[in-house]
Amino acid sequence: MTPALTITRSFALASCPSRRPRPGELLLWRLRGEWQMMTSEQGHLCLSKAELRRARMHPNRAHGRRFAIGRAALRAILGTLAGRAADTLKLIERDSGHVAVADCDRLDGIDVVVGYAGIWIVIAIAEGPVGLGMAQDSAFADPLARNRLRLDSLTDACGIGHGATPRSLERSAEPFREVVTPYAGNWCLLDIPLSGPACAATVAARHIARIHAAGWRGERGDWPTVGKQRARTAGSLNVPESVAAG
């Protein structure tokens, strides 16, 4: 079944869910590598000393700035979901961009992953495992290469033992697909719209029934046809509009 989709143009946290995701819900944010959700001063104030050091000492200055923007946004989002100040959260780094929140009962059992490609920052949050495959590569025009990125999202969610192959994903050309892996059960894969040269991303989760997407401003080509309907963005008042497809 194709998931329902809510797209919010605004980056304001008030326009996004203020609670942890329910089973089957996927929360997505797309940000540019610039201060959109808050000012630079506000963002740096909520970062930990280790995060500030990581941003400032990064060998690539642009990537260090992008990390600071993404981490500050993540703290603001998780603080909203947890009902706590962003700078009080204790974040634990895991593998491949995954982040856990320590000592926070309200966020127990959710998975958080942050990905980067070109100018884009994507944050995905769900209850249970979630994976993100995201990169900038001109090869993604090739269907097999695109399927490898989809496979990366699956591996990011459940590890390498799923047994799926890029060719096993060729049966569907839709941006949303449900796949059955030989060894890891059923998974949902969603291609995330990213404008710009050769950027692509796919998110994987065990079950996706509803998607809340923030930061997509209706650029042409965003959110291609899902099932038989096209996702629509919310109006100028930034009130989310839900579109059930399928």
Where do the language-model regions lie?
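Core catalytic alpha/beta fold that binds nucleotide/phospho-ligands
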Residues: 1-246
